[in-house]
């Protein structure tokens, strides 16, 4: 009598676990879900040509960066969205990303950075 009840308990526990069974495994295994690409940050600025880089920073290649202006107001909406986002092409500075030609932005602010200037990469030294 103890053996069937033990088997039922084990089957019940097995059903309640969040194991990755053959029929419901994500591609790449259980940990692959953590490696999903981040979404792009909200568009902002004139004509929606820019992307948010922080709660009050909007940057676009053609327009430069707007910090704390009306063009960057939409970026405050990012604080209320559940998933993280990422703007810019390549990393730069201390935790920032290239926002416009020669400008590196992080959520804290923007600064000039030669790593974000495509022409400085080809200039002679």
Curated annotation (Swiss-Prot):
Keyword Transferase attached: no
Species for this entry: Mus musculus (Mouse)
Recorded GO MF terms: neurohypophyseal hormone activity; oxytocin receptor binding
Signal peptide: 1-19
The name this protein goes by in its record: Oxytocin-neurophysin 1
Record-linked Pfam families: Hormone_4 (PF00220), Hormone_5 (PF00184)
SUBUNIT field: Interacts with oxytocin receptor (Ki=1.5 nM). Interacts with vasopressin V1aR/AVPR1A (Ki=37 nM), V1bR/AVPR1B (Ki=222 nM), and V2R/AVPR2 receptors (Ki=823 nM).
SUPFAM superfamilies for this protein: Neurophysin II (SSF49606)
Gene that specifies this protein: Oxt
